[in-house]
């Protein structure tokens, strides 16, 4: 089964950005801790080409091991609580799901292969 990537773009009401950021960062941290199938959960701040932050916008990028992991995430009771808390802060939310078609191959040494003979 392919890995599943989820991108969510948020438009936030004026003056609610800090509150939103605190909630979504906590959600990301808890999801990574609670859900083994969540491989990555990044909170992103979109920027212009010159690096200037785009006001009232945030994004998340999530990576799940497979569709089963996505389904488990969707059934996590905490998700409904988080969505209810975020709802009043949002003007809009756009979700894009994608299957990973070219997974990165493991490179380098695995933790089991690390030892003093590799130091040199």
Regions of interest found by a model, annotated:
Residues 2, 42-55, 82-120:
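Glycine-rich beta-strand-turn "strand-cap" elements at beta-sheet edges
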Residues 3-11, 42-76, 111-112:
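Short, well-ordered beta-strand segments in beta-rich or mixed alpha/beta enzyme
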Residues 4-43:
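N-terminal first-folded block
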Residues 17, 21, 57, 76-79:
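Short, structured helix-loop boundary elements
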Residues 18-20, 51, 70, 105:
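Short acidic, gly/pro-rich beta-turn/loop elements at beta-sheet edges
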């Amino acid at each position: 089964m392919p890995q599943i990537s989820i991108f969510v773009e948020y438009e936030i009401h004026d003056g609610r950005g800090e509150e939103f950021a605190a909630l979504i960062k906590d959600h990301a941290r808890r999801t990574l801790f609670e859900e083994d199938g969540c491989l990555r959960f990044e909170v992103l701040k979109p920027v212009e080409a010159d690096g200037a932050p785009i006001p009232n916008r945030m994004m998340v990028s999530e990576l799940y091991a497979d569709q089963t992991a996505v389904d488990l995430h969707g059934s996590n009771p905490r998700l409904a609580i988080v969505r209810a808390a975020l709802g009043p802060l949002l003007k809009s939310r756009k979700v894009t799901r994608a299957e990973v078609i070219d997974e990165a191959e493991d490179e380098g040494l695995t933790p089991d292969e690390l030892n003093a003979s590799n130091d040199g």
